[in-house]
């Protein structure tokens, strides 16, 4: 049971542990900034300081109204992970991830920001992804300030579509520059991102894959981290290796891997992927 306490512009969340590193530094989100004074995140046009204290998460500055309308759904505080982790304990492999991944949760991120961020993520590393995103935000976002922190909002489809491919290349986007430009223009011109909430997983994936720069893996990331379609199972070389080494399953295609995961983990396939992925990244290998 999540417990929320308000103290001016500071909010304390307890009752179910939320670990800053496990949530914001696990590959689902790219605007997390460790800081000597206090770590902070930027989502859409908002900056939030985040701090773990004992078994709680403290966040600030936020009004109660902003928290309830934006940060509460962003952090998916309506969802408990206790039952999910109980299910994972029944799996011989997943049960090893639960203690390490305690405090993780899937975020509900802005649809357009997630779309562009994961187009940038293709064949890329996290350090470079973050650098490209910040460059694009500086080029097309709005300059803002919270306390002493200056930052840029994530561009809207309208402002991002105003950047030329040459300008996107200057931001470090590389071969992804035309994908970003064309997709931003498509959304600006009416490509519907909201209808995805009402689609089945398969239909939503096909819909996203009509956009330039969106293949099956990128689509699954968007569906999982923005639309909370938890059956989405992003597949890369790490995930294929996990399935082969620990589940004795060697998929010939990404689609085979997704179907295996849905059969194995059901509606929690995407959450299972994040637990496995985070565990391998932090522990190097699962102890058999």
Positions of PLM-derived features:
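HhH-family (HhH-GPD) DNA N-glycosylase catalytic core used in base-excision repair
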Residues: 1-288
């Amino acid at each position: 049971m999540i417990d929320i306490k308000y103290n001016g512009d500071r909010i304390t969340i307890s009752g179910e542990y939320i670990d800053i590193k496990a949530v914001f530094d696990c590959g689902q989100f790219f605007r997390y900034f460790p800081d000597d004074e206090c770590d902070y995140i930027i989502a859409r046009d908002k900056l939030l300081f985040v701090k773990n204290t004992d078994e709680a998460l403290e966040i600030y500055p936020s009004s109660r109204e902003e928290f309830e309308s934006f940060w509460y759904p962003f952090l998916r505080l309506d969802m408990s992970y206790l039952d999910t982790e109980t299910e994972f304990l029944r799996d011989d492999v997943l049960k090893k991830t639960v203690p390490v991944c305690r405090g993780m949760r899937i975020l509900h991120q802005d649809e357009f920001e997630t779309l562009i961020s994961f187009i940038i993520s293709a064949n890329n590393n996290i350090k470079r992804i973050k650098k490209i995103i910040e460059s694009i935000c500086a080029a097309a976002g709005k300059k803002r300030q919270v306390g002493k922190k200056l930052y840029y909002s994530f561009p809207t489809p309208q402002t991002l579509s105003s950047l030329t491919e040459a300008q996107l290349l200057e931001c470090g986007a590389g071969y992804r520059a035309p994908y970003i430009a064309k997709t931003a223009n498509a959304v600006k011109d009416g490509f519907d991102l909201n209808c995805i909430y009402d689609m089945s997983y398969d239909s939503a994936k096909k819909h996203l894959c009509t956009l330039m720069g969106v293949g099956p893996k990128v689509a699954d990331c968007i569906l999982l981290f923005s639309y909370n379609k938890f059956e989405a199972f992003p597949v890369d070389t790490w995930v294929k290796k996990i399935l082969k080494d620990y589940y004795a399953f060697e998929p010939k295609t990404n689609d085979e891997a997704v179907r295996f995961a849905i059969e194995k983990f059901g509606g929690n396939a995407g959450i299972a992927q994040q637990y496995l992925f985070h565990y391998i990244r932090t522990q190097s290998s699962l102890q058999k």
